Amino acid sequence: MSTLDRSIQARARAHLFGLLRAGFRAIPLSDATRDRWRSWFLDRHADWVPEPVRGRANHAISRRPTARSDEAAIGHVAYRTTALPETLPATLVAFYLPQFHPIPENDAWWGKGFTEWRNVSRTLPQFEGHQQPRLPADLGFYDLRTPDVMREQARLAQEYGLGAFCFYFYWFAGKTLLEMPITQWHADTSITLPFCLCWANEKWARRWDGRGHDVLIDQAHSADDDLAFIAHVARYMRNPKYLRVGDRPLLLVYRPHLLPEPVQTAARWRNWCRDNGIGEIHLAYVQGFERPDPRDIGFDAAVEFPPNMSTPPSVTARQRLVNPDFSGDVFDWRELARDMEQRPLRDYTLYPGVNPGWDNEPRRSGKGRIYLHASPRRYRDWLARTVQHRLANAPSAHRMVFINAWNEWAEGAVLEPDARLGYAWLDATRQALTRAPDVATEICSPSACVVLHAWYLDVLDEMLDAIVECGTPLRIIITTDLTKVIEVTKCIQRRGIQAEVEGFENRGRDILPFLHVANRLLDENVQLVLKLHTKKSTHRDDGNAWRGEMLTALLGPQRVDAIVNAFSTDPLVGLAAPEDHLLPVTEFIGGNADALDYLTVRTGSDAPDTNSLFASGSMFWARLEALRPLLDAHLHASEFESEQGQIDGTLAHAIERFVGLAVTHSGHRVTTVEQTLGITKTPSAQPYRYARKAP
């Protein structure tokens, strides 16, 4: 077949697929029937699904890591211990993949020594901001044949609030694969973390999702196989640390409709367990491909399995491609979280699920299905809202949340510490169990903080005078170059000022240090921050006037209390800057168009329009919650250019123009200091003194 013929055939199939999909969606069907028909079609005709839209291959500057792939990002969290409540509000159960040790079958199918780490380590970023490869941190590229690995996993899981692991169990008509870690967990009395099993009852095929005809090992369901299966797993269910619902061992099945007769299978399992000393069991299935009422198939409950059964809007077309041939799908993970946390529970027993991200590019090179913009803080909120709201009326025995997953490294669903963010995902898990994300707290002076970047130390005293003389006690954090920490410390000691001093590499001007500090303050529940820096432009002769105008507007006598109160009384105010220095982004974009485009795509924010404003000079009051689109992007320091005295066109200059966009994307608004104070000013007819409009 010629290339032209194949192209015509592909277009015809895509057109037919669109017609079939439209008709399928128009037919009134139950969720269970619709899911079953969809799975049947895709199992047989996966090649009919049209190619996804492509991203953008041509952009001015390439922005991807060039030196190393294990750099810690803004928001990296170190290991830390925190006491958990004696009684947790829910049992968190994380799915656990045991494919981190070699087995003969994988040696034969994928090459000698294959484990999931081979997929993980080969991965390359497909577009800018694509965080690949994702590499492990403290646990390393572990081998589950080493008992201490699983002991450490159990310890971490318990310290960070998890209640159990759910191991994938692979059974093929009497043959098991990857069972060794489960056997090891079962036998190790030093491990006390509960566990349960999920029978991953698909065939194994060359395709990552089990579809297709190149079958590696198949299932052979029968009545005898049902009995052999339950007899095999019974030894695990007899273990005192096996997870129970009430007093019933919990057994999951991944795809129940692959069982020829699920009702009869469930009955056989129940009868065998009653006859062999197990007693009653609690059967649940995973809503990965289908959503029947569990009672209709002889089961007791269902388990949500995000991101499956949810398709947020595609953001593929926006991506700035590194690989021009990338043909995968990119979705907005935040929309997944928003959708799932608002879903009501069903009239049957349904255990809700959450997900810390998804990216199966390691298994599908150049064709991954990627959920972009996942962040530990947003995952924390999703998990907390699930526990507090979706489970609000659940009986105590059913207060379980399933997390997909603990260690799906090749699918980007991981709680274990990684090189980029450290323990952030585990820390967010623990926070979700110990804090209420939706409780509004009144902003008052102690929750307001000044972050002052001191580069030009000859004006530091002037800046400190303005802070001290504002009349409101404020927490002060001073950032500076590593070489200037001692001098800054001496200055504040000489003046008798209480301030924290933090040193940073001279990169990213005042912006990068501010992002580091703002991220930490947000985690400390500080609500409001005043961003300042020792503004003194070497390329202008009016830098002192610029600095003075902004200090007067932001810190003038009796202003600070009024500004803080304005943020407190109006929760939609996200940023306030001096009116004379709040400018339209599109008119002062300068040489920052490409970097600004990168930031909007990287953060999943809208591109600037004529209403978009920025604080020229980068001094402003801001609600830290309103900066989350920028902070939750977890930029790397290496993305900021080395300091060479640039006056425009760097990532720091672009972020100056982007901050307002982040605020509006978060659902807040940008306003002027004067408006928050009720001051009416006549707009100046003179051109802005301190920057030139774009031509």
UniProtKB/Swiss-Prot annotation:
It comes from the Bacteria. InterPro entries: RgpF (IPR007739), WbsX (IPR032719). PANTHER family: GLYCOSYLTRANSFERASE (PTHR41244:SF1), RHAMNAN SYNTHESIS F (PTHR41244). This is Uncharacterized protein WxcX. It comes from Xanthomonas campestris pv. campestris (strain B100). The lineage of its organism: Bacteria, Pseudomonadati, Pseudomonadota, Gammaproteobacteria, Lysobacterales.
